[in-house]
Amino acid sequence: MQSFLQSSELIISYFQSSLPAYLVLVFVFSLCVGSFLNVVIYRLPKMMERSWQQEYQQYFQPDQTVVESEPFNLAVPRSRCPHCQHQLTAADNIPLLSYLSLGGKCRYCRAPISRRYPLVELATALLSVVVAWQTGATSLGLLYLLVTWALVALSAIDIDTMLLPDQINLPLLWLALLA
């Protein structure tokens, strides 16, 4: 445990002394976060709608049997092409690079991929670099990055559905109250 703490302290001190290396790390990591945010942006409103439908059925139609559906959350099912429903490989999910290498089209059916996916990834990465540049490798910087990522997800969900999910809003509220 002691060696782990020493190693992590060395890594943190390196990034505190080398801003360019820290910004590159934040950019690459934030591209991955942006890819995950695309999943959140697409699936969280659908999960909320399913939950509302189940609650409605339980309250207004309690005598009807509940039909079990396939699991649908942020982890399952795996990502698929919205056109041909082919399950995407890990290589197809590499943030921004896979979009560019595939020319913005599905590898399997060649249907165009929405530009929103790379835009969310790139916006997340660029906003994160600005935050990291302003705050440096600090705990406050990490907090600001988390808030930035949450705001990216909330913005896109709001644009798509005019909803602001409590699953994202309430943690931000508590974070603001405790900070």
Briefly describe each language-model feature range:
Residues M1-A179:
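A membrane-topology feature that recognizes alpha-helical transmembrane segments
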